[in-house]
Amino acid sequence: MIRWCYFFLLSILAFIYSGCSDPSSVSDIENTIVDECSEIGSDTTFSKILPGTAGYDIIKSSDCGYVISGSTGKTILMKIDRYGNEIWSGTYGGISGSHWGNSVKETSDGGYIIGAAQNTIIKTDSVGVEEWHQKLSYSVHHYVEDVIQTSDGDYIVVGGAGGDPLGGHAVQGKAFILRMSEGGGVQWIKRYGIIDTPNNTFWGVVEADDGGFVLAGEKLQDRNFEFYDHFWVMKTDAYGDEEWSIESGGNLWDEAQDIVKLSDDSYIVTGKTSLSSTNLNMKVMRVSSSGQILWQNNHGGGNNDTATGITLSQNEEMVAIVGYTRSSSGSPFKYRIWGVDATSGQIMWSKIYGGNQEDKAFGIVESFDNGFTVVGRSYSHGSDRVNWMVKTDSLGNVD
């Protein structure tokens, strides 16, 4: 009887303790995920088809599952378990205009915030039910590429304004960073890009230790009325005002597509660089908190390689980068995953997966078993596009 009471008391104390440890910030959520889910699974691998959808982003959730944002023609949000089985999904066809789920993040209240491309941000509860949405009402479309929740509960939205700046609208072609309140109200917007150049875009954003933001994107240069993309990393203060900027590129097409932050407040950014008009390489760069390039490398050889997403390993020893590749201009694209040493930028391993039609990977996250889960858009599994989800082990292998 004494022994039973002892364990009963321990159970009560454990319940009280767990009730007092409610995550109150984005970093708390991430720590909770690591603490409670790190023992799940053991190098589980699989390849799974989610029909009728395209997957653009994937994250780990605080209850040891995964959440995918994408498109069925409209935005879709899908919760899956660690084996790729659907738990629930939400679609948002009632929101007017074109929109698709470019990015998703878990919020401090257990819900999700979705960057839904054309002018749209969607906030949901923990099971994907819409709580509110915001349509950005400017003179031209503002394409939302990424959204994060700040440490104080607001949201930062980044992307690019569509259209040709020569058409007479000053905001067209500019990259933008926008701050929203917790309830979705726009507080301010700042736009960047050289005058008379189209399609400057911020593709990814993270919050810095000082409360500012570091952005990854593409910035166009006008040279004798010819436009060239540059790989672009920019730091702003908490109000979106520029503090430093890095541009890397020549007379071709270079883009920074995604970014992760390390614990020392440095950043690893990935995207693509052009070696010639027919040869693209994946590009990866590490940048200090003050904007100094610590290292940068290209990978791909003679292939056409583009990186679209990046995830940092829990121990910060490596990043896994995802994108797509093809061996020649006439061949179909295939998924490609790179493992890159975070200290040197050197390739540790690389894997290619694909069929006989176009397959492009866009989102990647480190899994709970230290493998990686990838989502994208595939046409190799039937006549219609599908979200082809690939779960690898820690070296990028699939059994």
Give, region by region, the residue ranges found by the protein language model.
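C-terminal motif of bacterial Sec signal peptides marking the signal peptidase cleavage site
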Residues: 16-19
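Sec-dependent signal peptide recognition
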Residues: 3-10
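A sequence-level/structural motif corresponding to short, flexible coil/turn segments enriched
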Residues: 21-399
